Amino acid sequence: TVSLWRIDMFKNVITFIFTLLIGGSLFAQDFQKYDISATKIEKKAYEKYIGKSDKTDYRYEKDTIIDVDEKIDGNIIVIEGDLTVKGQVDGDILVILGKVKIENSAVINGNVTSVDGRIYQEEKSLINGNQIETKIKNLFPREEWDDDFEEDFERSRFGRNLDRYEDNYSTLPLGKQDNSILVRYNRVQGLFLGVAAPKSISGKYNKFTIHGFLGYGFQEKRWNYEVGLDRWFFDQRDYRFELGASAYDFTDTRDNWMITPTENSLAAFFLHKDFQDFYRRYGYEFHACQNLSIFLQGKIGYRNDSYEILNKNTNWSLFRGGRNFSENPIIEEGNMRSIYGEIYYDTRNNKKNPSRGWYAKLSGETSNSGLNSDFSFNQYILELRTYQKTGRYERIDTRLKIGTGEGDLPVQKGFELGGISTLRGFGFKQFRSDIDTLAIFHSGYDRMLLGNIEYNIDPKIFSTGIPLIDEIQYIFFFDFGNVWNSFDVTNKNEFYNGFSHLKWNDIKSDFGIAFSSRDGNVRINIAKRLDTAEKPFTITYRLSKPF
């Protein structure tokens, strides 16, 4: 009875969290992104793009269709909805936060304006006026912009927003992705050079996408590659269904969520410090994924992977020549056949440096003898993030990450915490499973709890007039969490067991301050752990946000 009650409680908690995430954002209108009221935005747009008109105004607040047999003598204003025109409009069209689709049968005797949207015109349609695509920020003087507008504007000036699509299909890889040239350096591969063909959602009529990479590690003396083929069905974006397959053989790491490959390569090349751990993974996978909206996507797949231990192959670094790289940790070798699934919800305005939006991801993986696998485990990970403005120049970013498992998690699947991006007052991966843990429990650490809170203050809140000071963003942060093995606290191995014992004394925590560039691409963290007064402050330098 107790076990059933705990299962029901766990399910209810998960349901509540996702209801809160999805429901909360659905009730939040797009206008709430801006510090300028919806009424003021509409008034400014009307004055600028319609102005004084003798025609009647027809105003709508939802998706609207002008059918082929309709003739509208007047101006059409659509707020937070899409407009499809098949008939005739004798007047101006203004759509705010929506798309305009003008079909072949349409005739428009006036201007067509889309504010924070797009205009799609079919070849045989007729528009006797101007077509204008613009942004809300263009309606107001610069000093009235939301701070997010200024960040986006500055980034776009230097081409740093090329990976963002106008409609922010955040669950789909649109536009320019990562660089096509790969350059890395680490203690296993030494110098790695390669080329990549990043995945994109492809064009309307090009339903197949080929993606992957090819490169060579000069110290490991081995080629690395991945080649994938995807085919989408039904709807290209909003309700896209996709089938795909890939084959690969490469030096892999699971540490990219802690530190980016670029940061790690720079640290290894210049500072003789390699933070990432590596292993060889080769095999193939099949997957199917379904977009339930432009922000919500589910995915299920099958993997057949072989894992091999990799040794350290170089000790060279440009500086600190007297040091040695640490040895690359061992893993459990073998063939892992698994079924995995994930569902995630993503409304972030920018994946690399988000300043608003939500992110939620629930993932699971199972591997067992029924799949002819050398491993037997189930693993589940839930991650929630929010980026919430609390004022014109203030924002709170939060992350909660929970991991659990059943069976015997191999070392390469065990949970690890400490240092960069996790518990910043502690050593990097200070809390991790190792061969001694494996010998005792026959499993890596199978429980994890991590929380991060950051309070961001924009320098404009002070307005000192000093150029350097006014470009520094101040971030106060608090981290808490730990990893452990369920057999330390209970003789039950179900995924929902092993958490009820937790007290605050079981949680590691730290606090600190960070100084960051306004775009968030450079930051210095100064953190102090809270479990002792003797340990010094920990200082880290980053070229990316921790989450």
Task: Describe each model-derived feature in a short phrase.
Residues 45-53, 63, 67, 123, ...:
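Outer-membrane beta-barrel initiation region
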Residues 15-25:
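Bacterial N-terminal signal peptides
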Residues 189-191, 199-201, 214-218, 231-233, ...:
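Transmembrane beta-strands of outer-membrane beta-barrel pores
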Residues 242-277, 284-287, 322-332, 336-468, ...:
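C-terminal outer-membrane beta-barrel translocator/porin domains of Gram-negative envelope proteins
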Residues 6-13:
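Positively charged n-region of N-terminal signal peptides that target proteins for export
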Residues 92, 111, 207-213, 240-246, ...:
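Residue-level detector of the transmembrane beta-barrel scaffold of outer-membrane proteins
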Residues 29-152:
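Soluble extramembrane regions of membrane proteins in the secretory/endomembrane system
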Residues 340-343, 513, 517-519, 535-547:
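Outer-membrane beta-barrel "beta-signal"
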